[in-house]
Amino acid sequence: MADKKTVTPEEKKLVAEKHVDELVQKALVALEEMRKLNQEQVDYIVAKASVAALDAHGELALHAFEETGRGVFEDKATKNLFACEHVVNNMRHTKTVGVIEEDDVTGLTLIAEPVGVVCGITPTTNPTSTAIFKSLISLKTRNPIVFAFHPSAQESSAHAARIVRDAAIAAGAPENCVQWITQPSMEATSALMNHEGVATILATGGNAMVKAAYSCGKPALGVGAGNVPAYVEKSANIRQAAHDIVMSKSFDNGMVCASEQAVIIDKEIYDEFVAEFKSYHTYFVNKKEKALLEEFCFGVKANSKNCAGAKLNADIVGKPATWIAEQAGFTVPEGTNILAAECKEVGENEPLTREKLSPVIAVLKSESREDGITKARQMVEFNGLGHSAAIHTADEELTKEFGKAVKAIRVICNSPSTFGGIGDVYNAFLPSLTLGCGSYGRNSVGDNVSAINLLNIKKVGRRRNNMQWMKLPSKTYFERDSIQYLQKCRDVERVMIVTDHAMVELGFLDRIIEQLDLRRNKVVYQIFADVEPDPDITTVNRGTEIMRAFKPDTIIALGGGSPMDAAKVMWLFYEQPEVDFRDLVQKFMDIRKRAFKFPLLGKKTKFIAIPTTSGTGSEVTPFAVISDKANNRKYPIADYSLTPTVAIVDPALVLTVPGFVAADTGMDVLTHATEAYVSQMASDYTDGLALQAIKLVFENLESSVKNADFHSREKMHNASTIAGMAFANAFLGISHSMAHKIGAQFHTIHGRTNAILLPYVIRYNGTRPAKTATWPKYNYYRADEKYQDIARMLGLPASTPEEGVESYAKAVYELGERIGIQMNFRDQGIDEKEWKEHSRELAFLAYEDQCSPANPRLPMVDHMQEIIEDAYYGYKERPGRRK
């Protein structure tokens, strides 16, 4: 008779790979068929499959028990019931097909798709329940699954999978929706995990298997080992805690990975707890028996030289306590549920503090709460990172402290950890037989694995516009002599007036004090009149210190933009002293989503803004410009918390403003309105304000400068505030960005700087750009058309957008000339060489300015440098190229 042919390892590998490839190819066909199923069909299939498994839960438990020789039949039946009942009930209403969620407000639509062919790895500890669980969550998500069962539980696992598969096919699932390797081997399992047709690996098993799954170069839902401590703190319900731990540890002879591996007991209740523990047939081994138990379970004795390399004897997994004791060499009373061994510490020197997957538990005494938490933490970190930890206590705060201290994904409070860990019995954890350990356990999932983990959720995002706003002072008073409101304003007793020397010398401060003195109540006031043009942060800090000492209930900012800007930041520092100036000046894309959140103001004081120039609009805006003169920087600060409480726009306060000041501030108004009108953030609400302000400027500025008549001064004062209302909500653009930086470097007058730059900016923004802004409010580039609208309103030639742009730029330049402004920087006394040397730096700084993001087109540094260099000579001499 011929000798039987020996199969080489290579031949064995090829056979395994061929078998696996056939399974995966069938699964891929099934996947396409499963994609066609609707939600109703899927739910029907899952329901029928779960009922079939439920009907066979007892015979499957018996099969698993007989095949593996491990665990407890009744408990295996319970685990099968759990997989069929709790898991299915939890995902019963979960949508897993097609559109699963639509939100008309956010514009998001979520679409669920299967991940693809699933490789299912199952352990010997829970063979049938895990096969049922993974099959059902795969069917729920329309994923075909191919199993590699543990060799020692191949037949019972296949029995469970077959029942689910046959019921699913009968209910409408495609053939080969559930398959398995028929001849288990390491080669076959490896081939399955590494097959290119497998989309993901759902692995439950030992650390080596999970590590292998993660090394396959594809998404894996692998879960790690546990080493679960149960800390019984002195305030715990002792009888309940002992009952729960015995029930949990003895369940299926301790084979659930979430079962307790050590109980840590406060010294104050140690004896009482041990007595209660013993009443449930827990046997405490003596010193000699402990050594025998260690030797049998791990092949080492406590504190021996080779403790570090101790390995669990796989023979003990799921075996009864009586059998383990007998095999170890000692006897215990019949009916013993658990073997308990008192240990002195957690770690390598005490091998019984390792995971044991059997009815063997370590018992440790804790000297204090801190010691109890430390020992629990050490248990988790001793080859059980991320899995589970339990605490029994009546102290809610201690539970939180414990949860923070231990590196466990599941912290189970006052419950048996076996059932607490798998979820949905004693707590609201997701019901699962695959428990993720997060990054602590080097897992990709940090929760109980469920159907949702086997879905690709596609998001369809509809285009949306952010909710816009109009935020202004709660009250704005205007008309001549409207400062009389100060007589009637409520709750005014301690007033700090922030102003400058000019307001004192011109008598405006006295007029404000006069109104306060006419109140029925006595008003105490503090004056800070040291605000300089372009106020420095040091000035703001000095004013804030005075404010803190005085403790006002009302702040009055009197003057032009400088006193109002300085007063706003003093207000902020006074009410919120912990604020850092560097945080305030950071740039943002969306004022509502900025990295630094400004605190709300107004709890201590109200803020009343009274402008005495017609330019900044600061009385109604959330902006302030503060200088850092030591570093030649100007910082525009923006947040709606800086919006004044009340604005008083009294034209009687601007009648004596010199003509050259009226000219400069008037052109600032025009720049505000123009930039707000074409801003990315412009809206129907701001456009009307901006257009009216532009109209008022062109109709009244020249007369206001040359004649200083009441009518034109009043209209320009109104135009300033109206433009402020517009740009407070639409923001500004690069004319202001460049003006801020040029002013900081060369100390030019702000309004005049804007006047010189504005014609260039109009032509720049009026050209269709190659590079548009990111996420503007408009749906197509329309700045050129909006300039055309302005030109038409002013009666300028504007038959095309291009003509309107040129007409408006020219009109702005000519208006500046008519009111006496030298419309170039050369005539502002700036050296040409120095100007050119700084042009690049100024362009970079302007790009970083807070006004730049709202410019209608994305401002490029090179382009702004070119504008700055051309503006030295003026629009008439060098209008610049269309960019």
From Swiss-Prot:
Alphabetized GO MF terms: acetaldehyde dehydrogenase (acetylating) activity; aldehyde dehydrogenase (NAD+) activity; ethanol dehydrogenase (NAD+) activity; metal ion binding
Cofactor (UniProt): Fe(2+)
Chain residue ranges for the region called Linker: 457-464
Record keywords, A-Z: Iron, Metal-binding, Multifunctional enzyme, NAD, Oxidoreductase, Virulence
Similarity field: In the N-terminal section; belongs to the aldehyde dehydrogenase family.
Catalytically driven reaction(s): an aldehyde + NAD(+) + H2O = a carboxylate + NADH + 2 H(+); ethanol + NAD(+) = acetaldehyde + NADH + H(+)
Region (Aldehyde dehydrogenase): 13-456
Role noted for this protein: Has alcohol dehydrogenase activity. Has aldehyde dehydrogenase activity. Plays a role in enhancing virulence in mice, under ethanol stress conditions, perhaps by inducing expression of pneumolysin (Ply) and increasing production of hydrogen peroxide H(2)O(2). May be considered a potential virulence factor.
Gene field: adhE
Active site (UniProt): C257
A Gene Ontology BP annotation from the UniProt entry: carbon utilization
Binding, NAD(+) 2: D500, D534, G561, S562, P563, M564, D565, T612, T613, V625, K634, L653
Highest taxon of the lineage: Bacteria
Inducing or repressing factors: Up-regulated by ethanol at both the mRNA and protein levels.
InterPro entries, per database record: AAD_C, ADH_Fe/GldA, ADH_Fe_C, ADH_Fe_CS, Alcohol_dehydrogenase_Fe, Ald_DH/histidinol_DH, Ald_DH_C, Ald_DH_N
Residues noted as binding NAD(+) in the record, renumbered to the chain: G438, S439, Y440, G441, R442, N443
EC class of the enzyme, as a word: oxidoreductase
Disruption phenotype: Disruption mutant produces significantly less acetaldehyde and NADH after ethanol treatment. Significantly lower H(2)O(2) levels after ethanol treatment. Decreases intracellular pneumolysin Ply level, but no effect on choline binding protein CbpA, surface adhesin A PsaA, or pyruvate oxidase SpxB. Mutant releases 1.59-fold lower level of Ply into culture supernatant. Significantly lower hemolytic activity in vitro. Attenuates virulence in CD-1 / ICR strain mouse intranasal infection model. Significantly decreases cytokine levels, e.g.
Tagged with keyword Zinc: no
Organism taxonomic ancestry: Bacteria, Bacillati, Bacillota, Bacilli, Lactobacillales
Record text about domains: Contains an N-terminal aldehyde dehydrogenase (ALDH) domain and a C-terminal iron-dependent alcohol dehydrogenase (ADH) domain, interconnected by a short linker.
Name of protein: Aldehyde-alcohol dehydrogenase
Binding site for Fe cation: D668, H672, H736, H750
Coiled-coil region(s): none
Binding site for NAD(+) 1: I121, T122, P123, T124, T125, N126, G206, G224, E355, L435
